[in-house]
Amino acid sequence: MPLLRRRVHTERLIPQTTPARVVPVVPRQVQQPAERPRVIWRFSDGKAGHDSQSLGLVDALKRRTRIECYDIPVRPGAGLDWMLGRFPAGSLLPDPWLAIGAGHSTHLPLLSARRARGGKTAVLMSPDLPKSLFDLCVIPEHDRPGPAENILVTCGSLNRMQPVYETGSNRGLLMVGGPSRHYRWDNHRVAKQISRVIRYSPVRDWILTTSRRTPPGFAEHIRQMIFNRNLSLTVLSWRDTTDQWLALQLSRSCCTWVTEDSVSMIYEALTAGVPVGLLSLSPRRRDRIVNGVQALVASRNVMRFSDWSTGHPLPRPRRVFDEANRVASSICGEWGSE
């Protein structure tokens, strides 16, 4: 039998493969660590007007960068802490990027904190200590500070208010102060002006709020004076209001009237941008506070009761009062990269 030879085709012994599929390599995205919040130590003497200023600046800084704010009540012994280079009140807190204080009793604690833990210091209002000791002094123009690289002049004091756009409401706000070093308080004079404002203004719905300085019984006296079924008057003591109450009321008001002694409340209303009328008082003397209020009248940013009573409508502020945001922008621009 003949030997049959099979021809072996070697190409069939190699397994057939399909061309390799090329899968594009997507670079792995590396998640960037979140920016660490900047630490603020806010020193407080417990006075509402001073807290309003420092909180206003903290609020404005939070609108620009991540912030962790720690409130530190001031206590005696700050001078000794400064001399010894220590600051026990902040021993459990992270190092500050910025320390803020308003009020004379916060000045030495600010310096003690910086010496012990570093960071920058910002003092609000003119300090008793030399201004050169602080990294930043935020001083109202009515204090007439001299020019210096670490001084930022503002139009009035800082506060927590934000601009209010016209709401079309028919509600008015009355803010009453009390006896002060700068003005002679007169219960009868203020009550008479309030009565005429409520009776002759086109506004029908009113809220009146007092302050710590308002004489006892004054608000109740106003309530008894005003009796008109076509009017609504709500009287609230300052004890019955919260931190954000004033901002809410200003946002709902078409106008506000403030006693002339209440400079902080005047600037809060101006910052909100609502028309502001002044319930007039007699100044004790011509000092920086009185001159500052007179400058607001002369610039037609506010109107005294005597001018309004002749038929002139309350004007909206002629300029924008946005000082907390302006100071915050300056701080972030100067120290934001540190």
Task: Explain the meaning of each model-derived region.
Residues R223, F227-S264:
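Donor nucleotide-activated moiety binding/catalytic core segment of transferases
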Residues R199, V293-E338:
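Leloir-type glycosyltransferase catalytic cores
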Residues W41-F43, S157-G217, S237-W238:
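Active-site donor-nucleotide binding/catalytic segment of nucleotide-sugar enzymes
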Residues R36-I40:
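Extreme N-terminal starter segment of soluble prokaryotic enzymes
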